[in-house]
A protein has these predicted regions:
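Short alpha-helix in the alpha/beta-hydrolase fold that links the catalytic acid
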Residues: 105, 224-234
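Gly/Ala-rich beta-loop-alpha elbow adjacent to hydrolase catalytic centers
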Residues: 169-173, 177
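Serine-hydrolase catalytic machinery in alpha/beta-hydrolase-like enzymes
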Residues: 24-42, 49, 53-56, 62-158
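A conserved short beta-strand
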Residues: 187-197
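Alpha/beta-hydrolase fold nucleophile elbow
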Residues: 159-170
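Short beta-strand/loop motif that positions the catalytic acidic residue
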Residues: 214-216
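C-terminal catalytic histidine-bearing segment of alpha/beta-hydrolase fold enzymes
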Residues: 238-283
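Acidic catalytic loop of the alpha/beta-hydrolase fold
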Residues: 219-223
Length: 283
């Protein structure tokens, strides 16, 4: 395992043949990652999720909370700790939206953390969930940086003044997880990211209050080895720690609805994530 660090988010969008030829090597911010929503290559690399319905066994339910922007509110899937707790895990969706696969994974984290942590899977698309990859690309591309950050800020306030946070996300959510750690400020205690686009802005990375643990794909052409190694250098420059591993697997390897699902890599990363979170939360 190597040591390293992570990234932000921004805005802008879209399209055309130019974009289809663009790779993640050329993309520098979260907003740049959103540009991939118009890339045919990137869209076609994502198989559509199989139908799945999740029913919570731990009392998970949809909740809403205020935000300071013009929308005024946001939502998420919340599973409360069995006893009152200041520990919160914020879970960030893939580009599909807050679907039942994400809710199931959020509940798995809750269960394997012994019910000692409040787990909140945030709805970053305000109720929109894609089942078609073209829609997923559209939703990701349309997401505004200001709105995404407002949702994060609302969640932090919803958790309470004494809350401490860790975050986890996949794909689009991997980038959001890093951004979340920055938004959480001094109350951030941990950050996990799965094959998410890193932040290049060293000044923003310097504001992190936590290390970052990352899992990346060695077979994809977007967030590839070059991108990850540059991220590692930027983290070092920022004086932060990134603990990462590049797997011999495709983008989306931890998604069970993905034909590229890699069971061994998924089990290894999940076990490492639970160990990391238990250490960070003192469980």
């Amino acid at each position: 395992m190597k040591k390293l660090i992570l990234y932000p988010l921004s805005i802008l969008l879209f399209l055309s043949t130019n974009l289809a030829a663009q790779t993640c090597c050329q993309l520098e911010t979260m907003g740049d990652y959103q540009l991939l929503g118009g890339s045919l290559d990137f869209i076609r690399a994502h198989a559509e999720p199989l139908p799945f319905t999740f029913v919570s066994k731990e009392g998970g339910e949809m909740v809403s909370f205020p935000t300071k922007d013009s929308t005024g509110k946001a939502g998420g899937f919340l599973i409360k700790a069995k006893k009152k707790s200041k520990k919160w895990l914020l879970v960030y969706q893939e580009w599909w939206g807050l679907n039942d696969y994400v809710k199931k994974q959020a509940e798995a984290f809750y269960t394997d953390l012994g019910g000692e942590v409040n787990v909140l899977a945030l709805d970053m698309y305000d109720g929109k969930v894609a089942t078609k990859r073209e829609d997923a690309g559209k939703y990701m591309g349309e997401a505004k940086e200001e709105r995404l950050e407002s949702i994060m800020q609302g969640a932090v306030k919803f958790a309470g003044k004494r809350a401490q946070f860790a975050s986890v996300g996949w794909c689009f959510g991997g980038g959001l997880s890093l951004k979340s750690a920055i938004v959480e400020g001094k109350r951030a205690v941990g950050c996990l990211m799965y094959y998410g686009m890193p932040i290049k802005d060293v000044e923003k990375l310097k504001t992190l209050n936590t290390d970052v643990k990352g899992y990346f794909s060695g077979r994809e052409k977007w967030i590839n080895k070059t991108v990850v190694e540059e991220f590692a250098k930027n983290m070092t420059t920022a004086g932060k720690v990134l603990d990462y591993k590049i797997y011999d697997a495709e983008h989306g390897f931890a998604n069970p609805s993905n034909p590229a699902f890699d069971k061994a890599a998924t089990e290894e990363t999940y076990a490492a994530s639970i160990k990391y979170l238990k250490m960070k939360f003192g469980i």
